[in-house]
Amino acid sequence: MSSRIKPHKVFELYQDDRGRRLYTKSITPGKIFFAEKILREKKEEYREIDPTHSKLAAAVVKGATNIGIRKGDVVLYLGASHGYTISFVSDIVGKEGLIFGIDPAPRVMRDLVFLSQERTNVVPILADANHPEQYDHRICGVDIVYQDIAQRNQAEIFIENCNLFLKAGGYGLLSVKARSIDVKKKSKQIFEEVRKKIEAKFTVIDYRILEPFEKDHCMIIVKK
């Protein structure tokens, strides 16, 4: 019988035999965290990642082939929220990797703490990404900075955190929400303005508009 799942061209991701769905190989088989669909094959468990709920998945579906994240990486995740995408990044980096999840909201941090009890490579930190001095003593240099923050100064937050924590040669992924920056300008104009700010500091290696999965969003991927 042919396999129902095969490696995706993006490292540590998988797809079904029709190439329509994205999966990660679970590091906590038997545990379901977000009512995600599960595919079991050859004693392995694969979790489906929904591009309408994850901007990382949306970027991959829209054609991003180098998201930079590898097994064993240390990740600084800004805007952790309830931990949906973090749970899949946790699969990607594996038990050898580590994720520092930053969020200022106590309610969502509670959910992230529950997630970290099962996924020990996730470290929840209640802090504001606008103020890295709140957590700079708790984290180390990282291989990846991933940011999903809906604030007007999201580009500046990303640049500051990359300057402080991202290792040379590391990758940054910035999810840009245009409407949080300006409600009057066209989204594409805002995307280009943010991209120019980022290009002044880092090498942009990919840029994807995330519609139809996420309206008024794009993903900018950089290398330091």
Residue ranges, per PLM feature:
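N-terminal auxiliary segments of SAM/dcSAM-dependent transferases
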Residues: 1-47
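C-terminal substrate-binding/active-site "lid" region of AdoMet-derived donor-dependent transferases
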Residues: 2-5, 108-111, 159-223
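Conserved alpha-helix/loop element of class I SAM-dependent methyltransferases that forms part
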Residues: 8, 29, 33-34, 50-74
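Residue-level signature of catalytic and energy-coupling elements of molecular machines
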Residues: 60, 79, 145, 222
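Helix-to-beta-strand junctions that scaffold the AdoMet/dcAdoMet cofactor pocket
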Residues: 70, 93-94, 165-169
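Conserved class I S-adenosyl-L-methionine
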Residues: 70-81, 98-100
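Conserved SAM-binding loop of SAM-dependent methyltransferases across substrates and taxa
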Residues: 81-95
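S-adenosyl-L-methionine
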Residues: 100-154
